[in-house]
């Protein structure tokens, strides 16, 4: 079974051509002006053997793209600009290689002599090269997967087939697998946090470069190769002549369009393809009796979510109107896609009743069509699809106000629900299947039917989110104006609960129709009304979840239930109106360390509320809880954040199992490790036992969306790993229950306590640390950059008032990445381990504790993933580069005190990590990632050096320091460094 499944998976791969490798004397020169050329013949290369041989095609692509960029740089800016870029690159390499102080002085002199225009050109060159290198790397990942498949290699970790084979090897039955899918729900949720640093125009150009680069892996004639190079040169030129930065801050509508572009390039086709492949693999690995190997359709367990247009936490520009606009644009995108696919099917399904029979239902569907052309009298499939198109066009007009791109043949009634459209397509599918047309049904038609199951008329569910303080203020005003309670906010928690529960049972509303409420209260009420409106218009799946940021008490949840009641979305179950129920699930978001620790108690109180069991029943006996990785990290540090999340998840699982309620966890993961980032596959597999249970939602944030989903093939792989990991974590949970788990957890608790102390002492208790952070990172410049529609800080960032506590976690992490310390991803671990070992006393006891840590690394996925992510962060960090940022702090005493502590902790962390893993080199167990990161340094480091120089100029206060070109240079460097690190916030 295993071999046949692997063979069939291999047969689906695209063949690649073999070409001779480049001469061994050619060494990679990953620079914007790399002069080492590469043959312009077909670059389809099947490599085997050494890592260097496997990476040869990647090196060739990087050299090739670097040469094109160098040519464009010479052409557009002159030879002198090209030589300047090369000199800076070579000097930065010397500085990196051995911390060469002479190289540092040369860099200082060189960078200071650059004019503002020269600086901008140099920054742009290195930034664009980082983007081009990322494209080459993505293409190489795709290439290597095809090579593995062609070679008949075993399925790769993270693949669906590997997950299914593992489940089969563990003795899982086909029935158990099907029960898993029946109850499963997996939802990636796109968000629009202010880490999206790339313009859509740049992304579009990069997609075309990626397509052309992939084209070079196919057999091309000489003329085709020449044309390919010409087009690539044109698009690189287009990049150079396209403004990289936005001149104005993004509006929410822009963020909506950016997100929708990923549906058009990736999700609409790749998600149905993912289902198809999964169904085929299930049929192969778990064949059903009498099914003859035919795939059985799976339920629509994998869907998409979005915060864009519904996330009001800290963003005053998200209103009821933006929610309506987001829903309308989503419907427009999916309906337009359906219309195009139906039109294409009409051209494809040309079967004639003179040659083949059709079903009675298909004939009836054709008869209902407004198409009565005699030319198509014997083509019922075409007539039926013309009718479907007409109804869908009417639906599009009704839901979006837009006409279909192609006019319908005649009038037809609109579909009221997506299920009606799906039923019509099923008639077509069944008729084809019954009359020797299975192959026709299995192509575009089957994918379209699956898309309707997944996307409906809404495309993606939009979550609503707001901070709990706003809800409290809104409810307080409603109660005061209604004469119910004049000082709600001053009540004790117990009194708030009593009042809110009483109001939820009252049939009357608090809202007065002719009263003018405050702007905030009116806006909040409008959001709830808009939610009810779009649910009625586009279907209930358009808005299903309401996230409450900073949930600290049970009343925070009850307030949102009351606001739903005011909008007609809560049924209290009295007066014969049926059982209680919420239209939109109320979901707490626990963010800080203290909130995480209180989460089990709050959820226990919620589940114990009188009558809440009826609400749960209406929700399918499920309740979701969201966990915040970002704020917990900023609050308590990397190690403590991860450990508190782990403990909270276990406590919630135990609570929900005891209550007989299904728990679904929503992971608010960011792009950086400090915000829960890192490889999704390992992150899901390392979740505590029993916490996944077939259901998971997780955020996909910032420009991480671009790196994961801009390339359709990369996007498909990322979607696949989410499903595979969820399947494995649910069906093979014993892998995360190693022997000695209690001992491991006790050790983690001790480490967490020590790490928490070290982190809090540095960040919140060190005098002047706030000033050091603002001086040595580009945090204020990031706040000024037009990254997203949401402000970077919850409060104005003036020097006297600003506090670390008030800074959002996203720019906090973004800033540490820019200065190459990436502190939120590692600080505190080294001293925590050292202190725990020292507490053991004797050398023998210390050795025993170190042995425990080694076993934890080898046997416990949670700890192994934690160390793996930290290893990756440390490999991207650079103390030499960071030391140059430290010089931006003018207070010498403060600078030396803080940076010396950070440096010492960094060195100690590297040492203890090596002692635990047995690896002296960073990423020794992941050489592909190690080489990838190493390849970026020659163009990443110069951007950091340039950024430091630009920050010096900008902050100097000298004449011209606030020049627009200096500001633009800083912003360009931020963009390029984020691209080079392949994550931002």
UniProtKB/Swiss-Prot annotation:
<keyword id="KW-0460">Magnesium</keyword>
<feature type="active site">
    <location>
        <position position="193"/>
    </location>
</feature>
<dbReference type="InterPro" id="IPR021135">
    <property type="entry name" value="PEP_COase"/>
</dbReference>
<dbReference type="GO" id="GO:0008964">
    <property type="term" value="F:phosphoenolpyruvate carboxylase activity"/>
</dbReference>
<comment type="function">
    <text>Forms oxaloacetate, a four-carbon dicarboxylic acid source for the tricarboxylic acid cycle.</text>
</comment>
<dbReference type="Pfam" id="PF00311">
    <property type="entry name" value="PEPcase"/>
</dbReference>
<dbReference type="GO" id="GO:0000287">
    <property type="term" value="F:magnesium ion binding"/>
</dbReference>
<comment type="similarity">
    <text>Belongs to the PEPCase type 1 family.</text>
</comment>
<dbReference type="InterPro" id="IPR022805">
    <property type="entry name" value="PEP_COase_bac/pln-type"/>
</dbReference>
<dbReference type="GO" id="GO:0006107">
    <property type="term" value="P:oxaloacetate metabolic process"/>
</dbReference>
<keyword id="KW-0120">Carbon dioxide fixation</keyword>
<dbReference type="InterPro" id="IPR015813">
    <property type="entry name" value="Pyrv/PenolPyrv_kinase-like_dom"/>
</dbReference>
<feature type="compositionally biased region" description="Low complexity">
    <location>
        <begin position="1"/>
        <end position="17"/>
    </location>
</feature>
<dbReference type="GO" id="GO:0015977">
    <property type="term" value="P:carbon fixation"/>
</dbReference>
<keyword id="KW-0456">Lyase</keyword>
<dbReference type="InterPro" id="IPR033129">
    <property type="entry name" value="PEPCASE_His_AS"/>
</dbReference>
<dbReference type="GO" id="GO:0005829">
    <property type="term" value="C:cytosol"/>
</dbReference>
<protein>
    <recommendedName>
        <fullName>Phosphoenolpyruvate carboxylase</fullName>
        <ecNumber>4.1.1.31</ecNumber>
    </recommendedName>
</protein>
<feature type="active site">
    <location>
        <position position="634"/>
    </location>
</feature>
<dbReference type="InterPro" id="IPR018129">
    <property type="entry name" value="PEP_COase_Lys_AS"/>
</dbReference>
<dbReference type="GO" id="GO:0006099">
    <property type="term" value="P:tricarboxylic acid cycle"/>
</dbReference>
<feature type="region of interest" description="Disordered">
    <location>
        <begin position="1"/>
        <end position="55"/>
    </location>
</feature>
């Amino acid at each position: 079974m295993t071999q046949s499944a692997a063979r069939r998976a291999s047969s689906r791969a695209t063949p690649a051509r073999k070409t001779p490798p480049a001469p061994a004397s050619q060494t990679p020169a990953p620079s914007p002006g790399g002069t080492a050329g590469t043959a312009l013949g077909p670059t389809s290369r099947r490599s085997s053997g050494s890592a260097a041989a496997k990476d040869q095609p990647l090196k060739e692509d990087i050299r090739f793209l670097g040469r094109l960029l160098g040519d464009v740089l010479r052409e557009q800016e002159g030879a002198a600009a090209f030589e300047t870029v090369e000199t800076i690159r070579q000097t930065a390499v010397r500085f990196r290689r051995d911390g060469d102080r002479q190289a540092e002085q040369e860099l200082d002199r060189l960078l200071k002599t650059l004019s503002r225009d020269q600086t901008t050109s140099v920054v742009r060159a290195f930034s664009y090269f980082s983007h081009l290198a990322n494209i080459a790397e993505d293409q190489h990942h795709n290439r290597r997967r095809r090579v593995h498949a062609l070679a008949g290699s075993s399925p790769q970790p993270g693949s669906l087939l590997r997950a299914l084979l593992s489940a089969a090897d563990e003795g899982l039955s086909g029935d158990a697998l099907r029960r898993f899918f029946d109850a499963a729900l997996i939802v990636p949720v796109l968000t629009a946090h202010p880490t999206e640093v790339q313009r859509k125009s740049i992304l579009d150009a990069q997609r075309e470069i990626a397509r052309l680069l992939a084209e070079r892996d196919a057999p091309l004639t000489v003329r085709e190769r020449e044309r390919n190079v010409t087009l690539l040169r044109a698009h690189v030129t287009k990049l150079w002549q396209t403004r990289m930065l936005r001149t104005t801050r993004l509006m929410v509508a822009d963020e909506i369009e950016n997100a929708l572009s990923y549906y058009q390039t990736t999700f609409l086709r790749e998600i149905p393809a993912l289902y198809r492949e999964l169904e085929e693999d299930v049929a192969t690995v778990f064949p059903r009796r009498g099914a003859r190997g035919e795939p059985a359709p799976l339920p629509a367990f994998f869907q998409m979510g979005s915060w864009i247009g519904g996330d009001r936490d800290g963003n005053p520009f998200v209103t009821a109107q933006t929610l309506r606009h987001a829903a309308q644009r989503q419907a427009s995108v999916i309906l337009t896609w359906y219309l195009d696919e139906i039109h294409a099917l009409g051209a494809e399904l040309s079967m004639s009743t003179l040659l083949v029979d059709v079903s009675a239902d298909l004939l009836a569907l054709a008869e209902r069509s407004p198409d009565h052309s005699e030319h198509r009298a014997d083509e019922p499939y075409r007539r039926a699809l013309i009718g479907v198109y007409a109804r869908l066009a009417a639906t599009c007009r009704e839901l979006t106000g837009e006409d279909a791109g192609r006019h319908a043949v005649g009038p037809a009634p609109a579909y009221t629900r997506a299920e009606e459209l799906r039923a019509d397509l099923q008639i077509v599918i069944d008729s084809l299947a019954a009359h020797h047309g299975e192959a026709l049904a299995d192509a575009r038609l089957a994918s379209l039917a699956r898309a309707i199951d997944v996307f409906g008329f809404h495309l993606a569910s939009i979550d609503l989110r707001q901070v709990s303080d706003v809800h409290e203020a809104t409810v307080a005003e409603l109660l005061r104006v209604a004469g119910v309670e004049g000082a709600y906010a001053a009540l004790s928690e117990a009194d708030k609960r009593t009042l809110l529960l009483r109001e939820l049972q009252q049939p009357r509303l608090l809202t007065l129709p002719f009263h003018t409420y405050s702007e905030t209260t009116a806006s909040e009420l409008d959001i709830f009304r808009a939610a009810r409106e779009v649910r009625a218009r586009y279907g209930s799946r358009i808005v299903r979840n309401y996230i409450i940021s900073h949930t600290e008490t049970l009343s925070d949840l009850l307030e949102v239930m009351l606001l739903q009641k005011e909008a007609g979305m809560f049924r209290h179950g009295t007066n014969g109106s049926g059982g209680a129920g919420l239209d939109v699930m109320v979901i707490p978001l626990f963010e800080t360390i203290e909130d995480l620790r209180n989460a089990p108690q709050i959820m226990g109180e919620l589940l114990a509320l009188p009558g809440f069991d009826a609400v749960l029943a209406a929700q399918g006996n499920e309740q979701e809880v969201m966990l915040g990785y970002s704020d917990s990290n900023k609050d308590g540090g990397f190690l403590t954040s991860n450990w508190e999340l782990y403990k909270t998840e276990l406590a919630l699982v135990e609570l929900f199992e005891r209550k007989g309620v299904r728990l679904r966890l929503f992971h608010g993961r960011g792009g950086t490790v400090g915000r829960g980032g890192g490889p999704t596959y390992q992150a899901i597999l390392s979740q505590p036992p029993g916490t996944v249970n077939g259901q998971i939602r997780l955020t996909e944030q910032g420009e991480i969306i671009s790196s994961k989903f801009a390339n359709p093939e990369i996007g498909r792989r990322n979607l696949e790993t989410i499903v595979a990991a969820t399947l494995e974590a649910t069906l093979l949970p014993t892998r995360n229950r190693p022997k000695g788990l209690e001992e491991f957890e006790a050790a983690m608790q001790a480490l967490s306590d020590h790490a928490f102390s070290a982190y809090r002492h540095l960040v919140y208790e060190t005098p002047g640390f706030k000033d050091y952070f603002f001086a040595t990172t580009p945090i204020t410049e990031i706040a000024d950059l037009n990254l997203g529609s949401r402000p970077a800080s919850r409060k104005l960032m003036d020097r006297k008032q600003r506090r670390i506590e008030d800074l959002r976690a996203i720019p906090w992490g973004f800033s540490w990445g820019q200065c190459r310390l990436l502190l939120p991803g590692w600080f505190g671990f080294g001293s925590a381990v050292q202190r725990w070992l020292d507490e053991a006393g004797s050398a023998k006891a210390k050795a025993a504790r170190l042995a425990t840590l080694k076993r934890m690394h080898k046997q416990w996925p949670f700890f192994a993933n934690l160390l793996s992510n930290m290893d990756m962060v440390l490999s991207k960090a650079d103390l030499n580069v960071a030391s140059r940022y430290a010089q931006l702090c003018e207070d010498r005493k403060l600078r030396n005190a803080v940076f010396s502590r950070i440096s010492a902790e960094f060195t100690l962390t590297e040492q203890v990590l090596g002692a635990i893993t047995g690896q002296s080199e960073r990423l020794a167990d992941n050489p592909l990632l190690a080489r990838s990161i190493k390849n970026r340094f020659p163009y990443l480091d110069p951007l950091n050096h340039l950024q430091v120089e630009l920050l010096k100029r900008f902050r100097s206060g000298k004449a011209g320091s606030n020049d627009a070109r200096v500001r633009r240079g800083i912003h360009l460097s931020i963009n390029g460094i984020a691209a080079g690190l392949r994550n931002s916030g």
